[in-house]
C-alpha cells in the first residue's frame, strides 16, 4: 500500500510541476490565467453575444414596426453594374482574325529529298514549256503532211473518175 501511495504522491508532484511550468509559459507569452476554470470556448461565446447585441440587423423579408429596429436596419444592397466588365470580357474573349492560314505541308514531316525537288522544280517548268512547244510543232507537221497526202488522194480520186467517165 505504501508503494501505491508513494507512486500517487510522486504523480501529484509531477502534475504540480507541470502546472507551474504551464503558468510560467502563459505569463511569458502574455496569456491570462484561467481562474474560473471555465473552458475557453465559453468566454468566446460570451464575447460574441455582446458583439451581436450591437450588430446591425438585416431585415430582408419583413418591415420592422419598432423605431429602434428601424434605426438599426441595414439599407438594402444595390446590385453592382457589371455590364462594362462583361463587355470587356466578351471583347477579350473574341478571337483575333487569322491573317495567314496554316499550311499543312509546312507542318508535316518532309522527305529527305525535298530540297532537291524544290531546286529542280524551276528547271522542270522551263522544260515543260519547251516540250509542249515541240509537241505542238510535231502535230502541225503531221497535219501538213496529211493535208498533202489528202490532197493528192483527192486529186487521184478525181482523176480516176474522169478516166472512168471517158
From Swiss-Prot:
A cellular component term from Gene Ontology for this protein is: nucleoplasm
Q: Which UniProt keywords apply?
A: Acetylation, Coiled coil, Isopeptide bond, Phosphoprotein, Ubl conjugation
Coiled coil stretches, renumbered:
8-28, 117-144
**Top-level lineage group:** Eukaryota
Q: Which of the residues bear the PTM N-acetylmethionine?
A: 1
Where does the record place the modification N6-acetyllysine?
53
Residue ranges of region Disordered? 1-56, 147-166
One Pfam family name is cwf18
**Entry-annotated residues carrying Phosphoserine:** 149, 165
List residues of cross-link (Glycyl lysine isopeptide (Lys-Gly) (interchain with G-Cter in SUMO2)).
94
| Compositional bias ranges of the Basic and acidic residues kind | 10-56
PANTHER family in UniProt: COILED-COIL DOMAIN-CONTAINING PROTEIN 12 (PTHR31551:SF1), PRE-MRNA-SPLICING FACTOR CWF18 (PTHR31551)
Protein name, entry field:
Coiled-coil domain-containing protein 12
